[in-house]
Regions:
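Extreme N-terminal basic, low-complexity initiation segments
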Residues: 2-6
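Charged, low-complexity interaction regions
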Residues: 11-20
Length: 222
């Protein structure tokens, strides 16, 4: 009885004024952080998670259907391991969020493990992130992708990261070069990708250029 009372007392002290739901959320956030940490070193449950994510990458991703507007490619909640010392989403996570979301876009046009196995891939040439508003743990972020330009070897993509109420928290633009991974040099984008990518680029060319496209670091804000 003494031991039980001590455990209850210590648990109450640790919980403080948090509700059961808040404690459950904290538990889940901690578990996610541990899983992501283990994934980075490929150990235990993290190894299982990494294999699962690789399997998702290898699987088929449906081709975009409504291409007459920026394409929603991903939604995710901001977890505790993404927060910085200010309590906001760490700036590096917006680059990660954009990069991972555009991976989904690439998979939707047929860029998967089978394509990689042919010795062809995309390499990043340039990226630029703009931080517009803050986001915090628990916020759901929606990422859309828009093709800004496309040529024989390069594709210029722009992503917008917004809260579900439409508040834009960040934007990013990236230029990717299609490469022959054996020769380590640029090469034409495969026809099996262009059959999906070219119509999207044509449709997006009719859209207004997103705010901030082409900006450089240090450029004055009007």
């Amino acid at each position: 009885d003494v031991l039980l009372e001590k455990i209850v007392s210590q648990s109450d002290t640790q919980a403080g004024t948090k509700s059961i739901r808040e404690l459950e959320k904290l538990r889940d956030d901690c578990l996610v952080a541990v899983m992501q940490g283990l994934k980075s070193v490929g150990f235990g449950a993290g190894e299982v998670l990494a294999k699962y994510e690789n399997k998702l990458f290898s699987g088929a991703t449906p081709a975009p259907t409504n291409i007459d507007q920026p394409i929603e490619v991903q939604r995710r909640f901001i977890t505790a391991d993404w927060a910085d010392y200010n309590g906001h989403t760490n700036d590096s996570r917006y680059m990660q969020l954009s990069s991972e979301a555009l991976d989904v876009f690439f998979r939707s046009i047929g860029f998967n493990s089978d394509y990689l196995a042919t010795g062809r891939s995309f390499y990043s040439l340039e990226s630029h992130v703009r931080y517009i508003n803050e986001s915090k743990v628990g916020d759901e972020i929606v990422v859309t992708a828009q093709v800004i330009a496309l040529d024989e070897k390069k594709v210029h993509l722009h992503s917008v990261m917004s809260k579900t109420d439409g508040t834009v928290v960040a934007t990013a633009e990236h230029i990717y070069l299609h490469v022959d991974t054996n020769l380590k040099k640029g090469s034409p984008i495969g026809e099996e990708l262009l059959v999906r990518l070219a119509p999207i680029a044509k449709a997006h060319a009719k859209l207004a250029k997103p705010d901030g496209v082409g900006r450089f670091v240090g450029q004055s804000v009007k």
